[in-house]
């Protein structure tokens, strides 16, 4: 590309604000010469130079347009280099570069090993560091003395963090800069940045490169000799070595020369942040060594740049923060969260549980503990707070390497914490250890009071103070050495809240915690008081126990139940905080909404009647108009443009358009024409107009106009003239998202399992818009046909007819209706027949122009890139419209030359707005994608496309990568079929090192223009009326009025500048709402998060950046690391890191409530949960990140809570819900077992505690059972609070009626089931990520979810996530209901149904009769396939991939097809797996076992012998495993010696062997279940607890074996196939073939058990659905509920099948219908038979009486009533005397 050609030269037209300024400080030509000179000197690429030249000129022009050229240059230099908020200046002082220039890093007293090396090198040079520092101090003092404007006190002189003198020197240096110098510095920085590639993610590293380059440039500028470097020198010498180091951390080359990912977790990867943080401290610079061992700091400043190519980067970098995959991060980062929950919970609970610490408590007396014991025990809460802080500090030691200079000093903090622990714990030792608990001591009482006060103070202090500045802020420490300025600057420069925001923040959290503590105390803690009392004193010594264990375990059953109850209550204590946060946040958001006027419930705003005036005052900048017009004329142009745009989008019919337009009508005098306003503005406030319809019912047009009017009633910044507005860019990342729907995609079913086409579904969703579209198309068709007829007959009269077609307000052919004959019936029928293609497809001709219209219509109503770009290109239309309206002299200037006028408008739009689509794959697009892209480029030629180009250079094996830019005006390359690049910038290598999106944004960011960037996803939309507000939105950055004073005058105390606005967020309208329950739920959540919560969070400083429609300050963000972060996995939710980075570095984030964009959301069950999984896993990665560490340990208390509950708190809350429910069910097992085996007392809640409980010897368990109802109510509220924000948002936005309607729709559509399931997915994805890692980008479906998914697909996708645990909950719930019936437990059936059946309930057409049985066939096939050849969709593959999470994969491959399944599982660390997958399941098993042992302990049965419950459990657990192992052992030899021979005649011999093994396992487990009944004496309750315990024992055994003993998996499935077919010889495994069969043997033993479980579970899920599929018309009702479709629409769209297809389906259904019901009958019989078996074998134990196995049976129907007359004599029946306390000093 020839940049010197006139075609690409920059002219005055392109940058008029700069070029036409009379006082321009430097001309464009001079600027260009500077760029060229720098390019030659440093070896920058020519293409990059041209790009950066245009970039700088665009920014200069943007600022000059509103402030003048001189001020524009200075302000830009201030923003990039020299200003108070410029990142370069901050870094320069933070990293002590000023001292490097004056004394040199090599002569400074550094820390750690850097100090030793400095001393050693100083000795070599023969200088003294001490002497050097002394000389510098003398020079510094001399400088201060010579400049009287520097006024420093003695304290400031000693304080080296005081930068007054350094600032003075800096300003002195800046003041000396000429405009040429400023441009040179800006140009050099931009050129360095423009080719920095991945180094752009390390802003301080880039600053260092720029600093070295600047020093070199300054030193060589004065020399007469011209310094030149070859092109690509900068890239090859400076950037590529750094890139190669970064790439080498994540990838390595395999034997074939391909780059493969390393199996390293984040803590072992030196990432972008680690590299960047090296450049924060002098100690980091000192580490930079060259290949010859010399240090870079020992080289002169002006020569350092030349040595970059010799730096040994691999020896320089190290980890500055360890992202260890551990829950410990949560303890350190959120220590205050734990303190404000653990300590108050302890205070509340211990105060209300005196029985736990009362010596010799007797219920008949209800004697109380001594006061000092009570106070001391309560005061232990302070000790808990200390322990939390100590643990947080210990864990911090592991995260932050001590060698990093920014690491906090933890030793002194630990000493302080140990002291706090001592003063909190010491009194308890004195009070509880030195005195008996029934002795009253005055001294101990005083000590306990003081201890309690100290505990409260300690808890409050630790709760409020950030961990990073616990006893004294570490950032202010060590002032004499400027040590921690970098940490302050880059991690803790949080913008302060002021005024309303500050009090809002304080108020919110005071209200939340006040309400929380009051509610928790009275509702949670007081309800626990009685259960604690009854369980803590319950004596279970009358249980017989177990043969092996005796009564040891059963005696403690009440205490075990109490511990579980306390833990469950603690879970609720955490949960209800989030509940109150939601409630208070909603209330505060309502208050904000009313104060801003954004609510529909603010009638005083006169939204519609004042709309014209508001358009005039808030949309138009009329103050500087050159010609004054009546306001009405200007308003009409804006309003008509808006409604006509809606008409063109087919949102309005011609009739509606006529009612909404401003129209010219004849005046009463008749000689002039006047402008008539539409009655619409008056109608909304006047009841007489209510009958008039201005919009179609429930139309998109009405919603848009309504929001537009509402938004203009809110406070909006006054717009500046168009030519003064800042330039901005819209950036749209695109990978493989749909660009434009193809014809086949919209008129054919998505798959054979869809029953409706996309077009039909769209017609159902948008009936009015389709009608308008069809009318429009018919008019166009008629017009073309008239033209054709006219051309063929040359009849001029006929040519007049189409003229009417061009006027949308006239009816077609209206003048000819009278002359035509009335149509006959045949004519009408013929006309209807001719109209059929229009109504069905939108066209009646296969011409591309017609089909394209239908494709575009459909694409504009789905989530396509075409919709996004057509929406956001409205900015261009809006700018042109506003410019033309506000500059009426333009029209007269061009005097009817519309083309010239249009060119002028186009130039203005191009100056102020640029659209960049980051089409990463553009060069690899297929034919359809290229065609769609070309269509876009022709429609919007000003749209730019950035993309990656790969070229294989001659004689080189490595590909060369280029970052390219093109647009619709670029030349067409006939060879590739693509546009030729305008810019082609070589990269160091493949830029996609991370998850993709961040890297794509990063390589494209160099092509942005202007000052601001709006980041958009490829599934959004925008509207003309919203684009008209762009000037007001950009003014939110508070940079429109630039300060004309030059900030570089030394000695002047400038006013403190407010923090820069980094991000301006905006609202989202989710256009995928109201199209089915799932789409509406997803839309509602996104809407509330993006609007309701964002409004409050922005006000209280808790809002971050969530991508989507936010506007970013281009200079602020690009000089601080870019738009997002990009380390693979760690930065999966990449956008939020930009927000955290901005907050940490002093940027402010705002929210604009008056501007909104459209946004699409996932619509199907699977795609929504894919998104949920991505977000949950991404949060797991965020918890490990250093940003969370900085925010969690340094934010003030109120800001910390805002950050926590808005981000990690939401996900941890889901985890707490999941854990609380699981813990509660384990409690129910133990409480149910207790209730089942004891004789309960008669309970009267109003009776005094001291009354004798009857019958004598009974157990008072009713308070504990009552507490269960309270727990269930709490969980119910916590679940349903998820609907509150959406409900409130709907009330505010659309009114009470619409809100109630939407909420009712959700309830009737079973939305609560979906909410429960989503909660489970969130918690599972978070837990799994922190256990196994492997978070990755999951592409979510953006199409309509109208396709039925197979049962096995849903089963395999969700069984590990929810269905397995759902069935465990089902069994536990069933046990709880039959052992301790409570009506409240019925709520949990919703949980069970959701966890087990939600995937099937929300599957389209799940209950279609024939499809259901065809599904059964595919499920059976899935179970038994994959054993003779590799099948991706098979149970064998599913179970292997599930296992690989624990084992990981071997790196060895044999080029087998089975290795292409995306195996990227890393082997998880043992200690990560230990907690989540071993310890927690073991705890569940342990508590299951306590319930199991107690229910078999024969409590209250006299003269009985303990049974062998443990042996019984071991028998039913190991018997099927043992039998399976024998069968597998025998089948192995059969497969080894028999199957290879049989395979020649019977290809499926291996499958037969697998079938035998798996079928045998199913039968064995079926018999094992019957054996459980038999051994438990046909008692269903006891059998159920044995089954539950057996399942958990299986789980823990298999997980332990898999984790500890199993080696890694091969990526191929050769070993699996060889096990069944015996062909081990061709597996390609080498010598490992010897031991592989042994490994496979143990794997197959476990797989046999897993197979049986999946077989039974799958069938159970299907059998439960049987009654539903037999209901008449169930498919229609189900579809109506899911998609909110009209029943008529459902019936109208039946899939048409051929006769052959119908016959095949019938055969399959008849065959598998029979199999299905046979299986159902067998399993039902095996389940029901044991209920009646007791009638035939009533006492199984008699069969083995007198033998060794006699105790293996559990007796049934025993008399366990040992109360009343049978009660032991040891039980108190009379009230004893009250013991008196002994009093001592």
UniProtKB/Swiss-Prot annotation:
Any one Gene Ontology cellular component term annotated for this protein: spore wall
Reactions catalysed: [(1->3)-beta-D-glucosyl](n) + UDP-alpha-D-glucose = [(1->3)-beta-D-glucosyl](n+1) + UDP + H(+)
Region (Disordered) location: 791-824
Membrane topology label: Multi-pass membrane protein
Record-annotated membrane-spanning stretches: 337-357, 375-395, 415-435, 444-464, 508-528, 547-567, 572-592, 712-732, 1215-1235, 1268-1288, 1303-1323, 1370-1390, 1394-1414, 1475-1495, 1514-1534, 1549-1569, 1585-1605, 1655-1675, 1713-1733
Keyword Ribosomal protein: no
E.C. numbers: 2.4.1.34
Post-translational modification: N-glycosylated.
Localization, UniProt: Mitochondrion; Membrane
Family matches, as Pfam families: FKS1_dom1 (PF14288), FKS1_dom2 (PF23605), Glucan_synthase (PF02364)
GO terms under biological process: (1->3)-beta-D-glucan biosynthetic process; ascospore wall assembly; fungal-type cell wall polysaccharide biosynthetic process
Highest taxon in the source lineage: Eukaryota
Keywords per UniProt: Cell wall biogenesis/degradation, Glycoprotein, Glycosyltransferase, Membrane, Mitochondrion, Sporulation, Transferase, Transmembrane, Transmembrane helix
Glycosylation sites: 844, 874, 955, 1002, 1170, 1360, 1579, 1761
Skewed-composition ranges (Basic and acidic residues): 791-801, 815-824
MF terms (GO), sorted A to Z: 1,3-beta-D-glucan synthase activity
InterPro entries: FKS1-like_dom1, FKS1-like_dom2, Glyco_trans_48_dom
Family from the record: Belongs to the glycosyltransferase 48 family.
Biological role stated in the UniProt entry: Required for spore wall assembly.
Classification via PANTHER family: 1,3-BETA-GLUCAN SYNTHASE COMPONENT FKS3, LYST-INTERACTING PROTEIN LIP5 DOPAMINE RESPONSIVE PROTEIN DRG-1
Record protein name field: 1,3-beta-glucan synthase component FKS3
């Amino acid at each position: 590309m020839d940049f010197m050609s006139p075609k690409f030269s920059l002219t005055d037209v392109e940058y008029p604000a700069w070029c036409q300024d009379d006082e321009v400080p430097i001309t464009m030509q001079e600027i260009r010469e500077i760029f060229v000179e720098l390019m030659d000197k440093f070896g920058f690429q020519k293409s990059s130079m041209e790009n950066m030249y245009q970039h700088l000129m665009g920014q200069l022009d943007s600022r000059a347009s509103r402030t003048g050229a001189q001020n524009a240059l200075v302000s830009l230099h201030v923003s990039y280099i020299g200003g108070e908020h410029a990142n370069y200046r901050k870094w320069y002082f933070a990293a002590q570069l000023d001292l490097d220039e004056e004394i040199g890093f090599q002569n400074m007293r550094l820390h750690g090993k850097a100090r030793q090396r400095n001393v050693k090198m100083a000795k070599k040079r023969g200088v003294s560091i001490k002497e050097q520092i002394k000389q510098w101090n003398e020079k510094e003092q001399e400088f201060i003395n010579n400049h009287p404007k520097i006024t420093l006190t003695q304290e400031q002189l000693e304080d080296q963090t005081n930068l007054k003198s350094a600032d003075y020197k800096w300003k002195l240096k800046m003041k000396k800069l000429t405009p040429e110098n400023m441009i040179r510095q800006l140009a050099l920085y931009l050129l360095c940045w423009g080719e920095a590639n991945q180094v752009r993610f390390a802003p301080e590293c880039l600053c260092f490169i720029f600093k070295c380059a600047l020093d070199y440039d300054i030193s060589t500028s004065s020399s007469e000799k011209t310094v030149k470097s070859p092109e690509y020198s900068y890239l090859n010498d400076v950037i590529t070595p750094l890139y190669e180091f970064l790439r080498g951390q994540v990838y390595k080359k395999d034997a074939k020369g391909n780059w493969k990912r390393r199996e390293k977790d984040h803590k072992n990867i030196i990432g972008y942040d680690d590299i960047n943080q090296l450049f924060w401290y002098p100690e980091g610079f000192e580490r930079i060594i060259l290949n010859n061992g010399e240090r870079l700091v020992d080289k002169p400043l002006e020569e350092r740049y030349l040595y970059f190519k010799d730096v040994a980067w691999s020896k320089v970098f190290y980890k500055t923060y360890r992202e260890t995959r551990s829950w410990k991060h949560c303890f350190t980062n959120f220590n205050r969260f734990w303190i404000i929950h653990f300590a108050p919970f302890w205070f509340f609970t211990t105060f209300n549980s005196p029985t736990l610490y009362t010596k010799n408590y007797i219920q008949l007396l209800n004697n109380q503990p001594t006061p000092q014991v009570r106070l001391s025990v309560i005061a232990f809460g302070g000790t808990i707070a200390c322990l939390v802080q100590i643990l947080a500090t210990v864990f911090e030691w592991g995260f932050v390497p001590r060698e990093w200079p920014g690491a906090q000093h933890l030793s002194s903090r630990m000493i302080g914490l140990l002291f706090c622990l001592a003063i909190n714990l010491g009194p308890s030792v004195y009070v509880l250890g030195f005195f008996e608990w029934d002795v009253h001591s005055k001294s101990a009482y005083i000590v306990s009071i003081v201890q309690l006060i100290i505990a409260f103070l300690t808890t409050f202090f630790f709760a409020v103070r950030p961990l990073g500045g616990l006893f004294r802020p570490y950032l202010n420490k060590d002032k004499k050495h400027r040590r921690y300025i970098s940490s302050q600057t880059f991690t803790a420069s949080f913008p302060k809240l002021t005024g309303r925001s500050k009090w809002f923040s304080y108020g919110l959290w005071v209200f939340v915690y006040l309400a929380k503590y009051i509610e928790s105390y009275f509702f949670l803690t007081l309800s626990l008081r009685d259960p604690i009392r009854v369980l803590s004193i319950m004596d279970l010594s009358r249980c017989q126990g177990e043969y092996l264990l005796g009564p040891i375990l059963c005696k403690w059953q009440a205490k075990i139940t109490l511990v579980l109850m306390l833990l469950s209550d603690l879970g609720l204590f955490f949960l209800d905080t989030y509940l109150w946060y939601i409630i208070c946040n909603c209330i505060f958001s309502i208050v904000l909404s009313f104060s801003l006027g954004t609510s529909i419930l603010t009638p005083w705003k006169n939204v519609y009647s004042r709309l014209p005036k508001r358009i005039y005052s808030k949309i138009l900048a009329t103050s500087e108009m050159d010609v004054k017009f009546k306001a009405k004329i200007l308003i009409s142009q804006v309003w008509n443009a808006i409604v006509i745009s809606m008409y063109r989008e087919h949102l309005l019919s011609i009739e509606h358009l006529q009612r909404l337009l401003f129209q010219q009508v004849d005046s009463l005098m008749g000689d002039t024409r006047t402008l008539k306003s539409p009655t619409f503005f008056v109608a909304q406030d006047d009841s007489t107009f209510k009958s008039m319809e201005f919009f179609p019912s429930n139309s998109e047009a009405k919603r848009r106009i309504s929001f537009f009017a509402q938004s203009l009633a809110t406070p909006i910044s006054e717009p500046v003239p168009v030519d003064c507005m800042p330039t901005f860019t819209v950036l749209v990342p695109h990978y493989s998202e749909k660009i434009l729907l193809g014809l086949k995609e919209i008129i054919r079913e998505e798959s054979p399992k869809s029953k409706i086409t996309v077009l039909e579904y769209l017609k159902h969703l948008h009936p009015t818009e389709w009608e308008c579209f069809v009318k429009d198309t018919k008019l166009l068709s008629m017009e073309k046909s008239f033209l054709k007829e006219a051309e063929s007959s040359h009849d001029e009269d006929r040519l007049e007819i189409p003229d009417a077609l061009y006027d949308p307000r006239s009816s077609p052919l209206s003048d000819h209706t009278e002359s035509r004959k009335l149509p006959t019936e045949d004519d009408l029928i013929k006309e209807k027949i001719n109209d059929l293609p229009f109504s069905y497809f939108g066209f009646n001709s296969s011409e591309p122009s017609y089909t394209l219209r239908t494709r575009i219509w459909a694409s504009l109503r789905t989530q396509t890139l075409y919709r996004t770009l057509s929406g956001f290109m409205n900015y261009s239309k809006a700018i042109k419209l506003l410019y033309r309206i506000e500059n009426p002299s333009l029209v007269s200037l061009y005097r009817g030359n519309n083309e010239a006028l249009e060119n002028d408008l186009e130039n203005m739009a191009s100056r102020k707005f640029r659209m960049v689509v980051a089409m990463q794959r553009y060069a690899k697009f297929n034919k359809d994608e290229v065609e769609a892209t070309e269509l876009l480029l022709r429609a919007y030629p000003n749209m730019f496309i950035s993309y990656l180009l790969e070229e294989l250079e001659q004689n080189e094996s490595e590909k060369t990568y280029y970052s390219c830019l093109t647009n619709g005006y670029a030349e067409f390359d006939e060879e590739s079929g693509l546009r030729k690049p305008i810019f082609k910038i070589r990269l160091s290598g493949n830029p996609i090192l991370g998850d993709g999106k961040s890297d794509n944004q990063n390589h494209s960011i160099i092509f942005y223009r202007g000052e601001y960037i709006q980041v958009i996803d490829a599934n959004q939309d925008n509207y003309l009326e919203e684009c008209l507000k762009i000037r007001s939105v950009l003014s939110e950055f508070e940079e429109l009025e630039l300060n004309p004073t030059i900030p570089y005058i030394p000695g002047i105390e400038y006013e403190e500048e407010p923090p820069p606005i980094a991000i301006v967020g905006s609202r989202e309208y989710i256009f995928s709402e109201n199209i089915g329950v799932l789409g509406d739920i997803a839309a509602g959540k996104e809407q509330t998060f993006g609007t309701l919560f964002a409004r409050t969070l922005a006000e209280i400083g808790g809002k971050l950046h969530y991508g989507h429609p936010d506007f970013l300050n281009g200079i602020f963000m690009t000089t601080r690391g870019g738009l997002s972060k990009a380390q693979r996995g760690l930065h999966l939710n990449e956008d939020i890191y930009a927000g955290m980075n901005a907050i940490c570095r002093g940027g402010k984030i705002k929210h604009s409530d008056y501007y909104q964009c459209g946004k699409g959301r996932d619509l199907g069950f699977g795609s929504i949960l894919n998104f949920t999984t991505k977000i949950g896993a991404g949060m797991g990665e965020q918890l490990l990140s250093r940003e969370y560490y900085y925010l969690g340990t340094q934010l003030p208390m109120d800001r910390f809570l805002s950050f926590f509950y808005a981000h990690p708190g939401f996900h941890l809350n889901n985890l707490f819900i999941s854990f609380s429910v699981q813990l509660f069910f384990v409690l129910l097992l133990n409480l149910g077992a207790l209730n089942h085996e004891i004789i309960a007392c008669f309970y009267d809640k109003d009776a005094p505690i001291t009354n004798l409980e009857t019958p004598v010897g009974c157990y008072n368990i009713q308070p504990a059972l009552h507490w269960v109802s309270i727990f269930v109510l709490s969980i119910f509220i916590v679940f349903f609070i998820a609907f509150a924000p959406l409900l409130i948002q709907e009330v505010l936005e659309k009114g009470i009626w619409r809100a109630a309607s939407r909420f009712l729709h959700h309830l009737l559509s079973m939305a609560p089931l979906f909410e429960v399931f989503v909660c489970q997915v969130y918690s599972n994805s978070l837990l799994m990520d922190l256990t196994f890692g492997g978070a990755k980008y999951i592409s979510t479906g953006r199409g309509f979810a109208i396709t039925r998914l197979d049962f096995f697909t849903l089963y395999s996708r969700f069984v590990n996530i929810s269905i397995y645990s759902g069935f465990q909950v089902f069994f536990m719930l069933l046990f709880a209901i039959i052992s301790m019936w409570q009506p409240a437990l019925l709520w949990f059936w919703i949980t069970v149904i959701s966890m087990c059946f939600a995937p099937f309930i929300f599957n389209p057409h799940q209950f279609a009769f024939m499809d259901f049985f065809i599904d059964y066939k595919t499920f059976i096939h899935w179970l038994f396939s994959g054993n003779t050849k590799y099948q991706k969709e098979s149970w064998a593959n599913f179970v292997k991939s599930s296992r690989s999470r624990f084992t990981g994969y071997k790196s060895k491959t044999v080029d087998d097809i089975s290795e292409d399944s995306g195996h990227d599982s890393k082997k998880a660390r043992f200690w990560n797996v230990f907690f989540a997958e071993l310890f927690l399941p073991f705890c569940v098993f342990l508590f299951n076992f306590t319930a199991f042992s107690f229910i078999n302990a024969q409590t209250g049965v006299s003269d009985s012998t303990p049974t062998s419950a443990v042996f019984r459990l071991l028998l039913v657990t190991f018997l099927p495993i043992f039998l399976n192992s024998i069968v597998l052992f025998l089948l192995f030899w059969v497969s080894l010696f028999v199957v290879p021979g049989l395979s020649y005649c019977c290809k499926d011999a291996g499958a037969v062997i697998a079938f035998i093994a798996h079928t045998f396992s199913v039968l064995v487990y079926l018999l094992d279940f019957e054996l459980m009944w038999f051994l438990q004496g046909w008692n269903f309750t006891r059998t159920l607890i044995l089954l539950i315990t057996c399942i958990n024992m299986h789980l823990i055994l298999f997980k332990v074996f898999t984790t500890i003993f199993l080696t890694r998996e091969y990526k191929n499935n050769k070993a699996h196939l060889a096990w069944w077919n015996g062909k081990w010889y061709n597996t390609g495994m080498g010598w490992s073939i010897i031991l592989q069969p042994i490994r496979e043997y143990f794997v197959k033993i476990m797989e046999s058990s897993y197979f049986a479980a999946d077989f039974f579970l799958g069938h159970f899920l299907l059998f439960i659905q049987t009654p539903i599929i037999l209901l008449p018309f169930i498919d229609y009702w189900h579809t109506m509920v899911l998609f909110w479709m009209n029943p008529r629409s459902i019936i109208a769209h039946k899939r048409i099948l051929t006769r052959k297809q119908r016959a095949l389906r019938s055969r399959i259904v008849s065959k598998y219908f029979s199999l299905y019901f046979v299986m159902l009958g067998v399993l039902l019989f095996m389940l029901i038979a044991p209920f009646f078996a007791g009638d035939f074998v009533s006492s199984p134990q008699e069969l083995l009486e007198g033998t060794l196995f006699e105790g293996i049976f559990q007796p049934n129907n025993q008399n366990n009533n040992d109360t009343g007359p049978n009660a032991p004599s040891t039980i108190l029946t009379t009230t004893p005397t009250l013991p008196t306390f002994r009093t001592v000093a």
